Amino acid sequence: MAQAQTTTIPPRGFGQTMRPDTWWIQPLLVFIGLSTFIVYSTWAAFQGKNYFFGNYISPFYSPELFGGSPHSWFGPIPGWWPQWLLFSPALLVLWAPGGFRLTCYYYRGAYYKAFWADPPACTVGEPRTSYWGERSFPLIMQNVHRYFLYGALLFILILAYDVWKALWFVDPATGRSSFGIGVGTLVLAINVYLLGGYTIGCHSLRHLIGGFRDQLAKSPGCYRAYACVSCLNRRHMLWAWVSLFWVGFTDLYVRLCAMGIWHDFRIV
């Protein structure tokens, strides 16, 4: 009986591939994009100033639990806060949306490739030869993404309330509020729309409302909700990047208006 011949494929070294395309461009762009956002958002979070302008507040600082602006929920910096410890309202809340993005299924695949080269791209050799997956610490902690989802949904409601407040402008002469729309109002509203599209299209939410394990819900309402989330989920990468850019731009817009560099034009 003839025996089949077997061929052993030697493991690829780091960066080795037979791909003829410029596969390295995408992970490079991801590295640049995420690095830029991380540096800017970290800098902005530690500033602790120029984060509000009239009825506008930066999404990095909302909800402002304690602080010196009119947007503060519970008043100024609490007396029990250590004098030696830097205080910024953003540091009290950014962990929630930051954790949601950090553990996002799409972002995990993106920054594993861009920052850890694990792997750099499909069919491209990676630095290590063994596969560990997300079964050991610290990567097993990525499973908390489903819990960050609840906080992210709550933040969408809070930011939507900020848009509502951005529709009311106070007259400095009389102190009365009147309805209006400024460029900043639109910037904040677009931010909620994009963050909503990214959050509602989340893989965890799709699984949550889809029904039971390995079985779709039979309720027509649940099925329609599942179809809606699935529609957003098909463009989850696009929602992830556009919303990331816009939330950073929203902070920049409010910050530059507060610094007097940009002028907020009233539309209505």
Put a short name on every predicted segment.
Residues 2-268:
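Membrane-embedded alpha-helical bundles that constitute the cytochrome b-like, heme-associated redox core
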